[in-house]
């Protein structure tokens, strides 16, 4: 029997040292029979004689130029006159797919001003204006038309003295309401109008987007998935370590560990960035590496799964000039690094030369120990941070956008003898229908089993609501 632990990390953006930080908090947490996957693409590319930004840039030689040596311009592949920038990435299920449980969209860029130029050895602004970057356009395979998306600001360096030359920003939007009811999830996703600095700026301009998708998979084992986001600069003076807990590796047999992530400003020919794993139970540390990603040049402008470059994108540049997206298995032969019964895992992000910003990281654990598997069985548990409702464990019997569907489910539960109530979450723009709120998880589980036995509701589940200031 094999087990799987997956750690997801989205990281990004060139920056000066000792930058301002945004504390990392849980964005999403769930127990689910399913998987997590990330897709994305860069949104600016080089423009040079004989090549437009829409043409893939494939130079991965030791002499390949860095993004601060190019005239960087917007990619725009959608043939839509209403967009100034757009790129696509393809999503497909790993194994048998199912309903999307969560989808989160991130976009980020270096953006001190609209455009700049290199004169001699000095970067000069050409257009000092800086447009609003909080909204983008988003197209899914199901809708095939752009939907405007407004984001939640995670970080903006425009007013930070240490960061203003690059002025990186990061935005996030929960797009679950667009993917969860979709009849077509597999296909190309397009993000348009991500703002970034054009031309040449200090350190080079980079920009991209990433879509995190958590989906149900009936053939999967129960997994715990947690995502965190925030902002922290990684420099030669400032490293970052995340201690993941709340899991326990199997008591016996082999299991696998995997990480995924996204970065900005990981230049191909600038060495010194490294990601390593430390396991307290074994006392061992190992650096991550693959044929695509050397241990001491981990962020190198590529999009990969293990040893293979991913090309299901438009454009499908082999050198993405400062944008990285990766998925890698962790070598753990004979449980040398991560032993059985391990309960914590540290991810270490370091840099010896250049700098980047970390803004999201996540953990997925598949095939939990017997006691956890038995406890949660097929019951989905989703954690939500909210200030507008009482914290506790809510037994959910339906989630809908349409008020007619809400009323129908409430009436349906009434016919079964339950007084269903509705909690409207403004952040997700969703109506959660629940039949009880409990202080203890065990009491909520009992109610779930009762609903299963006494109604025809297909999948009651638990919403774990926490209140954070």
Regions found by a protein language model. Name each.
Residues 1-22:
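Bacterial Sec-dependent N-terminal signal peptides
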Residues 20-375:
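Disulfide-rich extracellular domains of secreted proteins
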Residues 28, 393-394:
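Boundary/activation segment at the start of structured domains
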Residues 259-263, 384, 397:
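Aromatic/hydrophobic beta-strand junction motif of beta-rich domains
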Residues 288, 397-398, 435:
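Local beta-strand/beta-hairpin segments that build beta-sheet-rich folds
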Residues 376-380:
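Extended, compositionally biased intrinsically disordered regions at domain boundaries
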Residues 381-391, 401-469:
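Extracytoplasmic
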């Amino acid at each position: 029997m094999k087990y799987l632990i997956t750690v997801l990390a989205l990281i990004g953006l060139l920056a000066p040292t000792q930058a301002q930080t945004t504390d990392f908090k849980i964005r999403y947490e769930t127990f689910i029979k399913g998987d997590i996957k990330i897709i994305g693409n860069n949104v600016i590319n080089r423009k040079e004689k004989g090549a437009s930004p829409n043409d893939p840039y494939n130079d991965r030689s030791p002499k390949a130029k860095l993004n601060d040596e190019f005239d960087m311009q917007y990619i725009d592949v959608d043939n839509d006159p209403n967009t100034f920038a757009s790129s696509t990435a393809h999503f497909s299920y790993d194994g048998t797919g199912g309903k999307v449980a969560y989808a989160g969209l991130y976009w980020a860029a270096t953006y001190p001003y609209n455009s700049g130029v290199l004169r001699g050895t000095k970067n000069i602004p050409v257009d000092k204006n800086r447009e609003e970057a909080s909204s983008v356009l988003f197209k899914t395979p199901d809708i095939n038309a752009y939907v405007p998306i407004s984001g939640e600001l995670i970080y903006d360096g425009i007013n930070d003295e240490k960061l203003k030359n690059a002025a990186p920003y990061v935005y996030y939007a929960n797009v679950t309401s667009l993917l969860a009811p979709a009849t077509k999830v597999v296909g190309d996703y397009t993000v348009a109008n991500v703002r970034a600095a054009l031309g040449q700026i200090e350190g080079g301009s980079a920009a991209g987007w990433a879509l995190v998708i958590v989906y149900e998979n009936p053939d999967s084992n129960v997994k715990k998935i947690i995502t965190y986001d925030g902002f922290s600069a990684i420099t030669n003076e400032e490293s970052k370590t995340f201690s993941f807990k709340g899991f326990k590796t199997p008591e016996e047999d082999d299991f696998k560990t995997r990480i995924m992530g996204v970065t900005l400003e990981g230049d191909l020919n600038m060495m010194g960035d490294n990601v390593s794993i430390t396991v307290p139970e074994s006392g061992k540390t190992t650096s991550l590496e693959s044929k695509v990603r050397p241990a001491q040049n981990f962020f190198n402008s590529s999009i990969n799964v293990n040893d293979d470059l991913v090309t299901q994108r438009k454009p499908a540049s082999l050198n993405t000039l400062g944008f990285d997206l990766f998925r890698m298995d962790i070598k753990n032969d004979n449980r040398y690094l991560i032993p059985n019964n391990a309960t914590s895992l540290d991810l270490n992000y370091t840099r010896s030369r250049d700098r980047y910003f970390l803004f999201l990281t996540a953990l997925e654990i598949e095939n939990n120990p017997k006691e956890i598997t038995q406890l949660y069985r097929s019951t989905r548990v989703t954690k939500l941070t909210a200030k507008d409702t009482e914290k506790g464990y809510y037994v959910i019997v339906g989630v809908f956008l349409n008020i007619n569907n809400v009323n129908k489910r409430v009436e349906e539960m009434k016919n079964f003898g339950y007084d269903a109530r509705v909690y409207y979450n403004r952040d997700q723009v969703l109506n959660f229908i629940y039949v009880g709120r409990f202080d203890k998880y065990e009491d909520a589980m009992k109610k779930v089993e009762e609903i299963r036995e006494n109604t025809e509701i297909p999948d009651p589940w638990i919403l774990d609501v926490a209140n954070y200031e």
